[in-house]
Amino acid sequence: MQISEARAYIGEQCCVTWRDRLGKEQQSVLRVDDLMFVPMYGTYLVGDGEELHLEKVTGITRLE
């Protein structure tokens, strides 16, 4: 997922689909608070309970 795509979800309650280190698909329901760039690690999606590496995110769906 690109930064420009993820930026559209800031402030929204979302279901985020991502791949863990074993390659298995996981889902997390979280409120997307911000995007954060960490030098040498890349961009992270900051939620209300966890941070996900943006390169591992495969999809985001807004929840009502």
Predicted regions: what they are:
Residues 1-13, 17-64:
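Short beta-rich binding modules
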